[in-house]
A protein has these predicted regions:
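Conserved histidines in hydrophobic membrane contexts and catalytic metal-binding motifs
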Residues: 1-424
């Protein structure tokens, strides 16, 4: 197969591919493997706390009572009312309505009565690992975004550096040396999942560094006003002067059904509750659209003000609001999530085989190889061990689950090098 790139360009891209790959392999493997698990986030929430009562209904007549009771419950611990309260509706994959302001949270039954608070430390730990590496959110998200950029760069450099990668898409030298077998698997898994891997890299980069992008946009076009920059992408809130002290949720939902009959509400957000400019937003899924939701705005009387244009606004806004569902496979059936998980495992294996190729090529036999093996096998083992530990009473653990995870992973990885040292 004739390449459109010169031999010098191919050698240059191969060198770039190796440097980027070795520099980012450990974190890429961690992000890919944890992301494979996070695909089943809602299913894991249900499995980790199976005793929670489930329902597919939460009638509008109970919404005001729920919001008011929530505000009363949190008032003694707060200096001021929260800026926004979210009432999350039951869905097919998570039939557990709940109310939260991002700090406290309770599940609800079909009559709006308060049930347990969420107690899913393992799912939260894995999710935090994937989204921000348990670091402060801005820093962690920026690093995750950088891994998406590196993944995208590795995909393009890998394709350029291997002119026969598509021609040899089904070539496996099963009887060859370990390095050649690893090379074949690395290249085959890469090309088989190429569209998926590219999509994951691009969407992950976008979500991870969106905070940084907003800052750049604000600096270039909005005199460092980040709120204006966000409004330019996602739409601004309307100015509301309510005529009512209470919110008419049934009327708002009835008006939504009349305006958009196919819309499926997934959450209600009451902004500035109890104030004269309180605003009700209803986020609703639209059929056959990848956008996470469309957001419809209502005044306290339940009258429709406008919608945010996430599904029919500027194309950039539609794309930005579609990345989450596309990245996590949260747009179709469980079978799609299973397919995402299979692709995620394949992507994790690409990372592993890539490093193994380099170690074999350089004939590395010292502690570096053992540390890598400890990281590869230790990461899933520690994740499973933390799942078992999460079943124990929290008082039995000297550290929280996140700290326990990193301590165990450090011990396993470092222990691999120590074992090698003792053997030699």
């Amino acid at each position: 197969m004739t390449s459109i790139f010169s031999s010098d360009q191919i050698r240059s891209q191969l060198s770039v591919h190796r440097i980027f790959g070795m520099a980012s392999a450990a974190i890429l493997y961690l992000v890919c493997l944890s992301g494979t698990v996070v695909v089943f986030h809602n299913e894991l929430l249900r499995l980790e706390q199976p005793e929670v009562e489930e329902t597919f209904e939460l009638p509008a007549q109970y919404h005001a009572k729920i919001i008011n009771e929530y505000l009363q419950r949190i008032a003694p611990q707060r200096e001021a009312l929260p800026e926004t309260v979210y009432l999350v509706m039951p869905t097919q994959d998570l039939p557990r309505p709940h109310v939260t302001d991002g700090i406290d949270e309770w599940y609800l039954d079909a009559q709006g009565e308060f049930l347990q608070q969420p107690d899913t430390p393992w799912t939260e730990m894995i999710t935090g690992l994937h989204t921000h590496l348990h670091l402060p959110h801005v820093l962690g998200s920026a690093i995750i975004g950088l891994t998406g950029v590196l993944m995208t760069a590795l995909i393009f450099s890998g394709v350029v550096a291997h002119p026969t990668i598509f021609k040899d898409a089904f070539r496996l030298r099963r009887q060859a040396a370990d390095r050649l077998q690893a090379t074949d698997w690395h290249n085959r898994l890469s090309v088989w999942g190429l569209p998926f891997h590219l999509m994951i890299g691009i969407t992950g980069a976008f979500m991870g560094i969106s905070t940084v992008l907003v800052g750049v946009l604000a600096a270039l076009y909005f005199d460092n006003n980040q709120e204006q920059a966000i409004a330019a992408v996602y739409g601004d809130d309307p100015v509301v002067e309510s005529r009512s002290g209470s919110v008419d949720y049934p009327t708002a939902l009835a008006n939504l059904e009349q305006h958009a009959p196919a819309a499926e509400p997934i959450y209600l957000a009451l902004h500035r509750p109890g104030q004269t400019d309180q605003l009700l937003e209803i986020a609703a899924r639209l059929p056959d659209r990848l956008t996470y939701s469309e957001i419809y705005r209502f005044d306290a009387d339940g009258q429709l003000i406008n919608h945010q244009g996430l599904a029919d606004g500027p194309i950039g806004r539609q794309v930005a609001y579609s990345t989450y569902r596309l990245h996590f496979g949260n747009f179709a059936s469980l079978q799609v999530k299973v397919l995402y998980a299979m692709m995620g495992i394949a992507l994790s294996m690409v990372c592993v085989y890539g490093v193994n190729i380099w170690l074999s090529r350089k004939k590395v036999q010292g502690p570096l190889r053992q540390i890598w093996q400890g990281w590869v096998w230790g990461l899933p083992a520690v994740m499973l061990l933390c799942l078992i530990l999460s079943w124990l009473p929290a008082s039995w653990l000297p550290l929280n689950l996140t700290a326990t995870f990193w301590l165990l992973l450090l011990l396993v990885t470092a222990g691999s090098a120590l074992i090698h040292r003792q053997e030699h």
